[in-house]
């Protein structure tokens, strides 16, 4: 199982030399499992860049794109890549999206409402490829060889966290996770998703000082991510969903601070995600 990151920012994209090393695109990563179609996780602006890569692959093979995506929630920074995903505009292409059903309407209703005039020039029905949606709640299912566990996690609006297992390896993904005010309590669903995984990709958007002013904004601190990882017996922690205001230097400082925490000693590796990073989890 191999994981490649195409977007690691939260809230909105950013650009400029001060953000170059970590990258400015919003949440999108791709899991490659030998013999399976690509498994995309979140559909932020990084999806456009992945579309460029995938277009070259499918054109070399002479076959249309078939892929599956896991969508945590419907905030703009997690869906903005959809209309700019090049392969989805090719005849015969198919993208199946598993994501949270909504209190009023379906996942399909919500996505179609977000991609239509006047906010986008065409309706999603006019894409030449096919986008299939599957509403998901607290359930387990399979995508190819991957076993997927989906559970609701605290955030603003209906939001899922995912655990993916394949090739005897496991990862948990919680890009948007509201830390509790005490920053110690861990919800049972979160522990279930994270328990003993090889890699935890976790929201680390705020510093402790920022969290003091934004405790109800739906996100975590790097310190809380370390706490979750240590309590769940995670092997490796990767901080993600970086705040768009945090420069490369600031993200380095946040990471160094996280690594100095006493609980970090219980984790094999604590790092921060960056665009174009690829992690090979191998096979058990």
Can you annotate each of these PLM segments?
Residues 1-172, 191, 248-284:
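Binuclear metal-dependent hydrolase catalytic cores
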Residues 181-269, 273-274:
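Cap/insert and terminal regions of metallo-dependent hydrolase folds
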Residues 41, 72, 174-175, 202-204, ...:
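Active-site flanking residues adjacent to catalytic metal/cofactor-binding acidic residues
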């Amino acid at each position: 199982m191999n994981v490649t990151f195409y977007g690691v920012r939260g809230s909105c994209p950013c650009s400029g030399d001060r953000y170059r090393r970590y990258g400015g695109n919003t949440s999108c990563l791709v899991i490659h499992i030998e013999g399976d179609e690509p498994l995309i996780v979140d559909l932020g602006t990084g999806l456009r860049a992945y579309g460029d890569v995938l277009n070259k692959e499918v054109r070399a093979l002479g076959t249309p794109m078939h892929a599956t995506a896991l969508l945590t929630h419907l905030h703009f920074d997690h869906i903005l890549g959809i209309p700019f995903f090049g392969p989805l505009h090719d005849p015969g292409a198919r993208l199946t999206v598993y994501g949270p059903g909504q209190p009023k309407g379906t996942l399909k209703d919500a996505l179609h409402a977000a991609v239509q005039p006047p906010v986008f020039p065409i309706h999603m029905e006019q894409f030449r490829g096919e986008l299939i949606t599957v509403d998901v709640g607290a359930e387990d299912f399979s995508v190819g060889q991957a076993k997927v566990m989906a559970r609701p996690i605290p955030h603003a609006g209906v939001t899922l966290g995912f655990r993916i297992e394949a090739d005897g390896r496991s990862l948990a993904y919680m890009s948007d996770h509201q830390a509790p005010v005490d920053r110690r309590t861990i919800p049972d669903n979160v522990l279930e998703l994270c328990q003993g995984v090889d890699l935890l990709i976790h929201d680390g958007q705020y510093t402790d000082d920022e969290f003091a002013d934004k405790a109800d904004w739906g996100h975590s601190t790097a310190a809380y991510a370390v706490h979750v990882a240590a309590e769940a017996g995670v092997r490796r922690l990767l901080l993600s969903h970086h705040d768009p205001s945090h420069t490369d230097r600031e993200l380095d400082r946040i990471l160094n601070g996280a690594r100095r925490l006493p609980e970090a000693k219980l984790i094999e590796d604590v790092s921060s995600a960056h665009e174009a990073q690829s992690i090979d989890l191998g096979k058990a």
